[in-house]
Amino acid sequence: MIPSGLVYLLYPLGFLASLFFGSAFSIQWWLSKKRKEVYAPRSFWILSSIGATLMIVHGTIQSQFPVTVLHVINLIIYLRNLNITSSRPISFRATLVLMALSVVFVTLPFLYVNMEWMASPNIFHLPLPPAQLSWHLIGCLGLAIFSGRFLIQWFYIESNNTKDFPLLFWKIGLLGGLLALVYFIRIGDPINILCYGCGLFPSIANLRLFYKEQRSTPYLDTHCFLSAGEASGDILGGKLIQSIKSLYPNIRFWGVGGPAMRQEGLQPILNMEEFQVSGFAEVLGSLFRLYRNYRKILKTILKHKPATLIFIDFPDFHLLLIKKLRKHGYRGKIIHYVCPSIWAWRPKRKRILEQHLDMLLLILPFEEGLFKNTSLETVYLGHPLVEEISDYKEQASWKEKFLNSDRPIVAAFPGSRRGDISRNLRIQVQAFLNSSLSQTHQFVVSSSSAKYDEIIEDTLKAEGCQHSQIIPMNFRYELMRSCDCALAKCGTIVLETALNQTPTIVMCRLRPFDTFLAKYIFKILLPAYSLPNIIMNSVIFPEFIGGKKDFHPEEIATALDLLNQHGSKEKQKEDCRKLCKVMTTGQIASEEFLKRIFDTLPAV
């Protein structure tokens, strides 16, 4: 493809390109060290562009297609970094099109002739046997990884609007550079040995600078990072911020939260709503988004170093994050609010809690016993619902507003999400209609959101449930206190019915996939699944939980008829009163545990 005489230009061109690349990284490293942070000056991109242009010519002369095409891609990225801060930056799409056209333009000459993918000039006639295919694959992989670091940097600048380098850039550069160096030593290419050998030093130097900066940055005593991934955690977080502010008004709160936490002054880096998924299938479908959010939280904490981290519930996500933070050297105080259900499944998580936490805040009375023989500090705060429900004042006119019948009430709480309602409400309606109560009672459904009212109405109509009404979630406590009994989907709502002393039957229809995983993979087989039964270690409420083969509406209908007997209802109410007493015994006041956190911050 190129006249053979030009092969003697290889070394001067390659050496000159290496000088430009070396100068670019030397300037970048010197300025970064001066500024005490990883930094990419404009001169870096100019010098790198010149070096890439020379390497494109070098690769073309040497018939090295991978070298040529990867430097073409990198050249476009260098130019994009120069362009993004100009007065007239081109769009991401235009950059992508330009890159694709450049790759096609460079590839065509190589396709036209019978070229070698990774030819070696061997001007010095070194006694090296021909490299096997496996060596060429290693070389191509190393070059792809080494050049791929700029694709990562390009994605970083497009999403963050900054020309700086992410940590992953230097890690990828070090790995790819090592593979490429080993390959070029094998084929005896002195210019690329020089180029990629020297190219390791910027990665090592910048990684050293990054970790040195991370270790030397002081922790911010007045900063508290909080994270909640679910609505229940958001409510806990909002009340916690309220308590902290009353004692420590100078604390700044930021992190991940929902409306309750934001209302109390949390400055969000992400909104809680981005994490709301339920069931194994939904989690699998949201893995990329969850991982992206995980990386953002991790990097933000390590960069700003708040002295206190409080993670609220959402254990699978938060425990992964906590482990990674400790691995990266975070030495501030880490608190987890709400103990993961280690008593139900995956007990090995207890070890993670003991190794990485400074304090665990508990909301269930029996959980303190799980950590009796460990060094982990635990604090039993009690469940926030106990105080909330005991202080709740009913709205007297709610029946006139929502009900058009004086019949006694059977209440239904099918769940808070669309999938929960679709699976559970139909069974609840069928159970009611198959019981004797359908002749004497009305069926009232608590709706978690107005957007689900249509689904509820369609289900009631399809099942022919005539004496039925829908009321908003805000009036659920009024409904619990006024109904004869309730059908409730297993979850927090069951604890609410218990604390309101509402006779209840617990049920939950699982998806087939969730049923399979729960039974055969994770083997979650417990004597009880609802919190009142677990806390009291006895059957307060009957439970119907599982897939289609595990229970039928007729069985729930029979349980409804049994519950309607006066003695059964009074027995449940008495057990609920005992539950309230158990849950209020041994609680620590908020002022006491907050002083343990903020008055004893570690010297970091």
Curated annotation (Swiss-Prot):
The enzyme's E.C. designation: 2.4.1.182
**Region labeled Lipid-A-disaccharide synthase — which residues?**
221-604
Q: Which InterPro entries match?
A: Glyco_trans_19, Lipid_A_biosynth_N
Q: Which Gene3D superfamilies match?
A: 1.20.1280.290
Q: What HAMAP family does the entry give?
A: LpxB
Q: What family is this protein classified in?
A: In the C-terminal section; belongs to the LpxB family.
Instruction: Tell me what this protein is called.
Output: Lipid-A-disaccharide synthase
Please name the gene that encodes this protein.
Answer: lpxB
